[in-house]
Amino acid sequence: MACSIQHEGKIWPAASRVRVFMLVPTLEVPHLCAQCEDAPCIPSCPVNALQWNTATGAIIVDDDACTSCGSCLKACPGGVPFLHPATHKATICDLCGGIPACAKACEEGGYHALWVVERSTSKTSVSYRLYAKTPDKVTAELASRLYGDTAKELI
């Protein structure tokens, strides 16, 4: 909700850059851009509509340049980018320009499920790689840790 309010001015889950999936009862999984260090979405764009914001480390989409071809959607290992339901332009988390509204709302609400992790100089940043997976894969891994051998029955 915080994401769509920040970017759209209203609660609009279809336009939210953070998706939340409940794939196992009582286990909701946020799915958002990991701001991958190698960012395969950026070079996949044939018109260079995606760029790094050097101040925030976020991947930014130039809506004027985006042709809605979907190359970045296919290149993302986590399947995160999507075409905005109104503009049909590629949409990716832009970290709200520095302090993500989702992380702020999550902390203020006492959930502590999202937080901002400063980009590591290492190419093996676990915090970023966790979200660069599909919701099904993240949920399967979390369910396995929480429920052990019975996880497959729940999924």
Task: Show which residues each predicted segment covers.
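A generic, residue-level signal for flexible/boundary positions that often mark functional hotspots
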Residues: 12, 27-30, 55
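The C-terminal cap of the DNA-recognition helix in HTH/winged-HTH DNA-binding domains
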Residues: 5, 46-47, 77
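N-terminal cysteine/histidine-rich coordination modules
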Residues: 1-24
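Ordered, amphipathic secondary-structure segments that act as subunit-interaction surfaces
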Residues: 36-58
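Flanking helices and flexible, charged tails adjoining ferredoxin-like Fe-S electron-transfer domains
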Residues: 17-20, 24-35, 42, 64-155
